[in-house]
Amino acid sequence: LKVLLEGPIVDNGSTGTMTTKLFNLGYLPGQQPSTFLGIATPAGQPYDTAPWFYAGSEGDAYTTALGPKAGYPTNTTDWVLVSLRTSTSVSSTVCTKAALLLNDGTVQMVSGFDCCDIDLNQTYFIVVEHRNHLITMSHVKVAITNNTISYDFTAQNSYRSLLGYGQKLINGKYVMYAGNGQQVISSSADTDINSNDSDLWRTQNGSNSSYYLNDFELNGDANVQDKNLWLLNNGVFSDVPR
């Protein structure tokens, strides 16, 4: 499974890689910040709160008991939430896991949380969510081959209806839209990039050295560069059912 986030993309997407600044600075959940100004983020995957309420314990595998970097791979960009659905409806979800997103777009499942008890003969829509990017879903159902389900979100646009948006095309690669930091204030907040996200940015603008929802670039700081990303995507929405 492969997916890219717009915010941390480097070289305008030409290399298909993202930054690892949150890892480098020690701001990922469970890490020890690398400077005295850094604010530590408690261990645990970040999707145990609204609107996801995912209670998985994948994040417990990464703590300072394993050292200041908490045992994360050195090329970790952030966490994502991955789900499988038998139809486009969220009610058809049969599996959900928190996973690491590596800087080349690879989604790496946490050891011991690799798979769910699912029908290997079934096909599934693959859904990827991120805490401040727009939800995305595979454009077709995907079959399981050799006990593995594979899909490259960067190679083709994702699911969309006549009105909704899939992903953004940057330098030949599709990426998830940045700017969706406020996902709980209204019924459609998790699938829209709008003024609510800008309002959240204002409340945290100037914050630095930690793990923030309005840090769309994923570099540990909330500043005007993050607002500029929101401006680019204001009005974009997904019709992936939530």
Walk through the language-model features, giving the residues of each:
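Short Pro-Gly-centered beta-turn/loop motif in secreted/extracellular proteins
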Residues: 74, 108-123, 131-132
